[in-house]
Amino acid sequence: MIAIITGDIINSQNTDSELWLPKLKNLLGSWSATPENWEVYRGDEFQLKCSVDEVFSKSLMIKSLIKTFENLDVRLAIGIGNEVFLSEKITESNGSAYVNSGRLLNDIKIEGRTLAIKTENDKVNRDLNILFKWTSIDFDSWSVATAEIIHRLLINPELTQEELAKELNITQSSVSQRIKRSHFDLIQETDFFFRKKIAEL
């Protein structure tokens, strides 16, 4: 069983891709090789293959990175399933994980959602998609400042407030306030719940 994230950047036509595209590629490239495990195509769409238990945290890393750019957002469709054909390019590989993810992206575009999941288990789908609808209310409203903090903490949870303050060139008290506003502890709890739920598959 594998996880596939198919995503597309919202409002990409209004922002210079030279600003966000290299950073997205750097993030995806830090996890695995292209084009076998990830690829950016059509200018603002991408696909990533990863392990099932990591797919939610990786989705949030992508989301928080894109939200560090003013007016940008991203739709993320998570497909869980099998892989029946492995190509040298992820966009040519096939299996239920790919089908679930690709079709789901089309569905959430129509529905106006930004995060959803499709597995072979209807109960898991129902439970996690209700969770995602609630969490997306928060995720979609992240400010650039909040997204910067969340992204750094997701990439490196061991970062101290002092180190974050230095990186972002702000005071430690500002870091503390941003972490509180970001509900980062709740994000971690949600990831833990996701991993537990996905283990039911």
Where would I find each of the regions flagged by the language model?
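Short, basic, alpha-helical segments at the C-terminal edge of helix-turn-helix-like DNA-binding modules
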Residues: 191-201
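Flexible coil/turn residues that form the inter-helical turn or adjacent wing/linker of helix-turn-helix
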Residues: 156-157
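DNA-contacting interfaces and partner/effector-binding or oligomerization modules
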Residues: 1-106
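DNA major-groove recognition helix of helix-turn-helix
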Residues: 179, 186
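Short alpha-helical "recognition helix" segments of helix-turn-helix
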Residues: 160-168, 175
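Flexible, glycine/charge-rich interdomain/linker segments that couple
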Residues: 85-92, 108-130
